[in-house]
Amino acid sequence: AFGTEVDLPSVHVEGIRHIGALDITYADELGYAIKLLGIARRAEDGIEQRVHPCMVPKGAAIAAADGVYNAVVAQGDFADKVNFVGRGAGGGPTASAVAADLIDIARGNRVPVFGVPAGKLLKAAPRPIERRFGAYYLRLMVIDKPGVIADVAAALRDHQVSLESVLQRLRAPGDNVPVVLTTHETQEANMTAAVAQIAALEAVVEAPRVIRIEQF
């Protein structure tokens, strides 16, 4: 998309293994859908490339891509946002793609994978995930006792992370209870440091779950 070489080792990749049913439920309550996205952005300090689960607003076109449908969102300097949605799996779409490749081979059409010959691709510095600036969803499982939320908020404050919302379900005193927080936009490095401090709290009984929130 940017006429640059793809530096595969620098692509940040996460799967969906850490996503649980609770996260899907809370995402819905918060007005989001969870999608596994591949994201590439060009910034002044390099090319950002990452693949991981995201929360996206339920009203976004990309949130409606379910089942065999895939979606691509492209944003340009003058065209603003352009959405492409279509079937990406199933007998018909797969057969069509294979047939198109066979026809290109038969005709001798050589279309570069990235739109231009590999020798003409430019080199660009990768932009590390630590520089991402955005909002976050954080789910904790904690012992329900006084002061826990204050300790969590203090850890976030220590790393310049501002809270946007907090959800907590009532349980019997002493039981473990899920606590869900969303943050305002902050840098990934700050969020990572805050989560590490929160995970070390005695009242936190499971590894914190973090999902990035993307606006499309």
List each model region and its residues.
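A conserved regulatory-domain signal marking ACT and ACT-like small-molecule sensing domains
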Residues: A97, L102-F216
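Short acidic (Asp/Glu) and glycine-rich catalytic loops that position anionic groups and cofactors
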Residues: F2-D7, Q75-V82, R132-F133
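Substrate-binding/catalytic subdomain of NAD(P)-dependent oxidoreductase enzymes
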Residues: A1-A64, Y69-A71
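Glycine-rich phosphate/pyrophosphate-binding beta-alpha loops
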Residues: D80-V82, G86-G92
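Structured core elements
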Residues: K35-L36, R50, V73, N83-V85, ...
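Mid-domain beta-loop-alpha active-site segment that forms a flexible
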Residues: A1, T94-A97
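A glycine- and small/hydrophobic-rich beta-loop-beta segment
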Residues: A71, D77-A79, G108, V113
